Amino acid sequence: MSKHSLKQSVRTFFYYSNMRLILLCLAASVYGCLLVYSAARSADNGMSGVIMQIGASIVGLILAMLISQVDYEDICRLWPVWSAIAVGLVLLTFTPLGLNVAGTDDTAWLGVRIGSFRLTFQPAELMKITFIITFAVHLSRVQQDIRRFKTLVLLALHAMIPIGLVFLQGDDGTALVFIMIFLSMLLVSGVNLLYYVLGLAGVCALVPLAWTYLLTDDKKARFLCILPPYIEKYLGTTGWQQYEGLKAIGSGQLTGLGYLKGGNGFSFARNNDLIF
């Protein structure tokens, strides 16, 4: 491609693009980098996280602009490719290549070292995008039968693939995100609301059984640690993050302490867990 044609392509892109959306994305990225710097500036190797955030923001904006030029139908046609890549990367976390990062107990990351920087990547984040694509394709193909129970079962089996993989990784929080994506997309697709009512009733009925026979003591503690009788008991273990969150909200309240004035330095991933 000649220099002239490249320049013309760039001009055409910006002419036909939603500049308001691009500027909002740019502003959100800059704001995010400033918050990461505020949260991580005093941490060991804190600036490496800031540099990676800036780099990721730049790469992300460029990729977003490039992908926006591709017809979404072409993206949907390649859903088997996206699924294979995302699931394959998640499966790699079950091999010796899988990593767990500081402050976590689940092996859900892959990593690569570039010079003095160690880049970590959580494949489940990519699988969120591919799940939205593949599930949207699935919904579009069964739209005429969306209210049939058999269709709902097949859709649920589709969702169980990423949800099950993430649960096996030990990342319950991300699995819940997949569940919410699944339920939200079902809701807007026109699924009979009666299924939601029946599902909610079923979950409520299963809670006592799950509490008694399925949940480990560690997972029970995650619920109990926010209740007054158990706060002190789990303060230094399971309830530590909830306690630190309450402190952060209590000290900053609605308006916050101010930029660069946050005093919490005890979080394993302060640029992530306590960024506010």
Predicted segments, located by residue:
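Short amphipathic alpha-helical coupling elements at transmembrane boundaries
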Residues: 141-144, 151, 181, 185, ...
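Hydrophobic transmembrane alpha-helices of multi-pass, membrane-embedded glycosylation machinery
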Residues: 175-187, 201-205, 223
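Short loop segments and helix-boundary regions at transmembrane helix junctions
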Residues: 187-196
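Membrane-helix boundary/helix-loop-helix interface segments in multi-pass membrane proteins
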Residues: 2-23, 28, 34-169
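Hydrophobic, glycine- and aromatic-enriched re-entrant/interface helices and adjoining loop segments
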Residues: 101-113, 117-120, 198-276
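Interfacial segments of alpha-helical transmembrane regions
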Residues: 79-83, 195-204
